[in-house]
């Protein structure tokens, strides 16, 4: 034992113990040499749960999914060099979707920087503006001051990650050899006795009385709508429905709002707006005087276009994190306050009996007719087209299940075909940067928190993150993956690129012709190809009770999928015009 090893051990023990005291319960470790002391110390901690993922990109998204589902800060640890760069996609997603990650990267000491040392690169501010904060940690030293320094930066990192708006932070640890700390006796036995733990308290932003009264006045007796995009806050669901009923306003609810599957059916929740907001003849009858938007922008493009072209109205965006999430730049009033506070205070202050019943009835009649058509079409569909897959998931998912939704076509199909239901289904997706990478790993991370967990994903997105399946095999995780295999980029069939047949398939369709049964075998997953509605039901039912990884593949045709969507939209448009 050397003095260096003892100093290293005490310094890192102080840092790691403070992470745990501040609320960290899990750490995802990517193996490497320079990060050895941090990895060993984390493994030695008596209450810190560690997961080891050999692929850094997968590890980043696994941590993201776990933090997203648990709403707790999760630690990521890797060695120096390109290992840290592989965390970048997950860091970007965490930043844009406000997920608390604490990224720890090991580094060469200062004397080995910029001198051509192996596995060394400039890691200072590696993630740029995609993290809330960066700290290049000091080298360990034998002093009480440095132990306080380590604990202080540990508490600060958790605080910054968790403070609204939540997000990732990056701490870079330069470490000198030798890299093996002292594990006997346990470095955590007496830790914390010399130095106090930092207690962190949070508050919610509120509005002053004059701002509240102004907003109440602007909304009283007006024709308004709530627009609720991705927002993972269960505590908002019932208060929002109650306020909407009091005002007589519809709630245009994105699948990730939680309002389509929070355990109750309410007519104020509008779930088919994506279909009827396409129709110019209908739009004139649905022009509001007030819009109040919560969460990020919904996935629906027709909804976005409609909101973008509303003029002369009061448009509130409720944004407690001051992130200015208003891509259409329609806001007239930016509200920086806690969402639950706003809902409660408006409920208390809004006068009774000022609503226009005909306004809400117009929305609900359109929505009910569109929903009837969607449900009827799906009930009469006997083949496993993409809409039918989502419709069957809606019917078959058990109460309190989790559903992680892939980007590109899956989230849009869920928007169209997963209408409101009186089951509690927790829907999650990576809608920060909307990438198709890392989705398998994110779902596996979320499966640590929610069970049973299902993943609806496209074939290209699944291919992107097959490495992530190793975590399911290694830790015997329970996840059911439904692959919608349309042999390529199905979303592009709906975009203008589809009108360029000369290059469409080679540049956008990108058929892979992969047989995923071999991927299932490689990672010890139960595989089933569903060729009929009955076989899909059988596979989902079996997977609901099976422990481990299940992969259900459904092969579809992207050209038929586009035609089916268009036929459905046309049928809805015709039916809605007949209502007037």
Swiss-Prot record:
Its EC number is 2.2.1.9. It catalyses: isochorismate + 2-oxoglutarate + H(+) = 5-enolpyruvoyl-6-hydroxy-2-succinyl-cyclohex-3-ene-1-carboxylate + CO2. Keywords: Magnesium, Manganese, Menaquinone biosynthesis, Metal-binding, Thiamine pyrophosphate, Transferase. It holds the Pfam family TPP_enzyme_N. It comes from the Bacteria. Binds 1 thiamine pyrophosphate per subunit. One of its GO terms (molecular function) is 2-succinyl-5-enolpyruvyl-6-hydroxy-3-cyclohexene-1-carboxylic-acid synthase activity. Its cofactor is Mg(2+); Mn(2+); thiamine diphosphate. The keyword Magnesium applies. Pathway: Quinol/quinone metabolism; 1,4-dihydroxy-2-naphthoate biosynthesis; 1,4-dihydroxy-2-naphthoate from chorismate: step 2/7; Quinol/quinone metabolism; menaquinone biosynthesis. GO terms for biological process: menaquinone biosynthetic process. Belongs to the TPP enzyme family. MenD subfamily. Catalyzes the thiamine diphosphate-dependent decarboxylation of 2-oxoglutarate and the subsequent addition of the resulting succinic semialdehyde-thiamine pyrophosphate anion to isochorismate to yield 2-succinyl-5-enolpyruvyl-6-hydroxy-3-cyclohexene-1-carboxylate (SEPHCHC). Homodimer. This is 2-succinyl-5-enolpyruvyl-6-hydroxy-3-cyclohexene-1-carboxylate synthase. It comes from Listeria innocua serovar 6a (strain ATCC BAA-680 / CLIP 11262). The lineage of its organism: Bacteria, Bacillati, Bacillota, Bacilli, Bacillales.
């Amino acid at each position: 034992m050397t003095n260096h090893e003892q100093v290293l051990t005490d310094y890192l023990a102080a840092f790691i113990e403070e992470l745990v005291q501040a609320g960290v319960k899990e750490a995802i470790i990517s193996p490497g040499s320079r990060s050895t002391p941090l990895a060993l110390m984390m493994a030695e901690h008596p209450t810190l749960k560690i997961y080891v993922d050999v692929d850094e990109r997968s590890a980043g998204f696994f941590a993201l999914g776990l933090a997203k589902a648990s709403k707790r800060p999760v630690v990521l640890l890797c060695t120096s060099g390109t290992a840290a760069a592989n965390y970048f996609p997950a860091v970007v997603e965490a930043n844009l979707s406000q997920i608390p990650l604490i990224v720890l990267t090991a580094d060469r000491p200062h004397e080995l920087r910029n001198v051509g040392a192996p596995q060394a690169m400039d890691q200072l501010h590696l993630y740029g503006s995609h993290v809330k904060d960066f700290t290049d940690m000091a080298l360990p030293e034998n002093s009480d001051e440095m132990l306080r320094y380590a604990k202080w930066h540990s508490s600060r990192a958790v605080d910054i990650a968790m403070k609204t708006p939540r997000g990732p932070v990056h701490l870079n640890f330069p470490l000198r050899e030798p890299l093996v700390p002292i594990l006997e006796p346990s470095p955590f036995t007496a830790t914390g006795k010399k130095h106090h733990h930092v207690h962190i308290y949070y508050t919610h932003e509120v509005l002053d009385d004059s701002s509240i009264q102004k907003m109440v006045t602007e909304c009283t007796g007006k024709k308004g709508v709530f627009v609720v995009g991705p927002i993972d806050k269960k505590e908002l669901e019932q208060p929002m429905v109650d306020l909407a009923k009091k005002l007589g306003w519809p709630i245009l609810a994105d699948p990730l709002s939680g309002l389509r599957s929070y355990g109750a059916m309410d007519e104020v929740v509008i779930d088919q707006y994506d279909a009827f907001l396409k129709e110019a003849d209908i739009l004139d009858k649905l022009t509001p005087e007030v819009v109040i938007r919560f969460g990020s922008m919904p996935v629906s493009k027709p909804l976005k276009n409609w909101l973008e072209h509303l003029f002369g109205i009061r448009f509130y965006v409720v944004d407690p994190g001051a992130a200015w999430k208003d891509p259409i730049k329609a806001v007239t009033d930016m509200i920086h306050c806690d969402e639950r506070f706003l809902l409660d205070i408006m409920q208390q202050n809004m006068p009774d009996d000022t609503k226009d019943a005909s306004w809400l009835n117009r929305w609900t009649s359109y929505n009910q007719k569109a929903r009837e058509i969607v449900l009827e079409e799906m009930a009469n569909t006997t083949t496993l087209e993409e809409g039918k897959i989502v419709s069957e998931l809606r019917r078959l998912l058990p109460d309190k299940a989790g559903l992680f939704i892939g980007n590109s076509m899956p989230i849009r199909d869920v928007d169209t075909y997963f209408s409101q239901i009186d089951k509690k289904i927790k829907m999650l997706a990576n809608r920060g940067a909307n990438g198709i990478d890392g989705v398998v790993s994110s779902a596996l991370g979320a499966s640590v928190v929610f069970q049973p967990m299902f993943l609806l994903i496209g074939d290209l997105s699944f291919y992107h993150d097959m490495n992530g399946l190793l975590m399911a095999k290694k830790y015997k995780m329970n996840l059911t993956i439904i692959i919608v295999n349309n042999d390529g980029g199905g979303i592009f069939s709906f975009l203008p690129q589809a009108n360029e047949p000369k290059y469409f398939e080679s540049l956008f369709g990108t058929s892979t012709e992969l047989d995923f049964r071999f991927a299932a075998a490689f990672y010890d997953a139960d595989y089933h190809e569903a060729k009929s509605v009955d076989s899909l039901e059988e596979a989902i039912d079996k997977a609901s009770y099976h422990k481990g990884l299940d992969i259900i593949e459904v092969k579809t045709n992207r050209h038929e999928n586009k035609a089916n969507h268009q036929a459905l939209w046309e049928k809805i448009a015709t039916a809605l015009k007949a209502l007037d």
